């Protein structure tokens, strides 16, 4: 029992002695390493040889892409490693001490910065400790939220792919003093973004010569390639715009008598203007390229604007004043003949044929009316009823040998009657008959003028219907072509639709 307790106490004392010796070795090692160490001195064995620094990064998150200010915000961990000739020791002389850590400013480290930084502090990294092992290998892993300037190409927005460069290099050391070598970027810990899909982050090492110095300045450039996810913009911008474009076509289906054709066109035009303002708020104020969605909105606004102009013409045709003159011959030929035939449109009542009355030929003349004046009054009144309404539409039907009534009207003799109705003197007889004949002339002329005015108005209204139908077909085809042609012109349209809308 006493022997076992003694063994436990011996083991505990040995472990405490080992810890105390290790802490003593670390303290001694730190003193030896920083003794006569100058953090401004480049840690190489031969000053004529460059110090090789390996550089890489680990992308964790794409935090924001500011299209208007053209700034990319990312969460990145930098990875830098080099060999410090003055920070080496023999592990056997310092047992248990394999690695040591030095804070910022105590040992030398490369001054690698982001060249295209858009941050106010320029250096956005958090200065962590430098990890050093016994062979002098130094590893520096500073994390940071980087804001870099990036040219945002909005040519294919919202089906665009952006390429933002992150250029890193030493600020004060040239290629003869510091040899910067690239290692592949790490995206194993990347957190997916709701707005962007990370395509890749390839890197490239290059050297650049400046006018101040003869030596080259190496740099490592990583290109963050990302594709915009279009589901949000499709549901909030594209689909509403397509629906509004379809509403613009309803202007041509709305009857002209409703009085709302112009109002509908102006409302659709204002709706598109609101969507254009939404796009302008997020797009950069650049004249290098016009966004794809802006092109689509502009084409749609042109269609709606032209529809409003055409609607004004249609309303002018529909409400044309008959006293303003008849339709020009070329307008009648183009609209009422060619376009109406092409659109398979016919005038209202054009196919209606009045039934022919099967009666024997009756010749009614004013002479017979005059002869009937001496007859009983009922006979003369019955004949006078037809005298007043003969030729109301300005057409006089010639008598036929088989039937005396054609197209629902009596075939009257055009010789003596027309002479009387157009100012001829009635035969001598009853003066009341002359007054009645004068009233009949006035009524016939009045109805004839009304029929002519109605015919002119009907002709203009039919022309308005033809223009409406023609513009409906033309604008529908143009809208479909613009929608398919503009949106599908994006290089990755199919990929975006298959991934985001599937």
Swiss-Prot record:
Which intervals lie on the Cytoplasmic side per UniProt? 316-469
Which ranges make up the Extracellular topological domains here?
A: 23-233
Q: Which InterPro entries match?
A: Neur_chan_lig-bd, Neur_chan_lig-bd_sf, Neur_channel, Neuro-gated_channel_TM_sf, Neuro_actylchol_rec, Neurotrans-gated_channel_TM, Neurotransmitter_ion_chnl_CS, Nicotinic_acetylcholine_rcpt
| Origin superkingdom | Eukaryota
Cleavable signal peptide: 1-22
List the cysteine pairs that form cystine: 150-164, 212-213
**Membrane topology for this entry?**
Multi-pass membrane protein
* Entry-linked Pfam families: Neur_chan_LBD, Neur_chan_memb
| Reactions catalysed, as given in the entry | Ca(2+)(in) = Ca(2+)(out); K(+)(in) = K(+)(out); Na(+)(in) = Na(+)(out); choline(out) = choline(in)
Its activity is regulated as follows: Activated by a myriad of ligands such as acetylcholine, cytisine, nicotine, choline and epibatidine. Oligomeric amyloid-beta protein 42 activates specifially CHRNA7:CHRNB2 nAchRs. Activity is modulated by positive allosteric modulators (PAMs), such as flavonoids, with a wide range of chemical diversity, pharmacological sensitivity and efficacy. AChR activity is inhibited by the antagonists alpha-conotoxons RgIA, ImI and ImII, small disulfide-constrained peptides from cone snails. Alpha-conotoxin PnIC selectively inhibits CHRNA7:CHRNB2 over CHRNA7 homopentamer.
UniProt keywords (A-Z) are: Calcium, Cell membrane, Disulfide bond, Glycoprotein, Ion channel, Ion transport, Ligand-gated ion channel, Membrane, Metal-binding, Postsynaptic cell membrane, Receptor, Signal, Synapse, Transmembrane, Transmembrane helix, Transport
SUPFAM superfamilies referenced in this protein's UniProt entry, alphabetically: Neurotransmitter-gated ion-channel transmembrane pore (SSF90112), Nicotinic receptor ligand binding domain-like (SSF63712)
A GO molecular-function annotation: acetylcholine receptor activity
Instruction: Tell me which residues bind Ca(2+).
Output: 42, 44, 172, 210
Listed under GO cellular component are: acetylcholine-gated channel complex; apical plasma membrane; axolemma; cholinergic synapse; dendrite; external side of plasma membrane; glutamatergic synapse; neuron projection
Q: Where in the cell is it found?
A: Postsynaptic cell membrane; Cell membrane
Q: A Gene Ontology biological process annotation?
A: dendrite arborization
The segments labelled Essential for TMEM35A/NACHO-mediated proper subunit assembly and trafficking to cell membrane in the record are 260-267
Q: How is it modified after translation?
A: Glycosylations at Asn-46, Asn-90 and Asn-133 are essential for TMEM35A/NACHO-mediated proper subunit assembly and trafficking to the cell membrane.
Function, in words: Component of neuronal acetylcholine receptors (nAChRs) that function as pentameric, ligand-gated cation channels with high calcium permeability among other activities. nAChRs are excitatory neurotrasnmitter receptors formed by a collection of nAChR subunits known to mediate synaptic transmission in the nervous system and the neuromuscular junction. Each nAchR subunit confers differential attributes to channel properties, including activation, deactivation and desensitization kinetics, pH sensitivity, cation permeability, and binding to allosteric modulators.
Assembly and oligomerization: Homopentamer. Can also form heteropentamers with CHRNB2, mainly found in basal forebrain cholinergic neurons. Interacts with RIC3; which is required for proper folding and assembly. Interacts with LYPD6. Interacts with CANX.
Q: What is this protein identified as?
A: Neuronal acetylcholine receptor subunit alpha-7
Identify the species of origin: Macaca mulatta (Rhesus macaque)
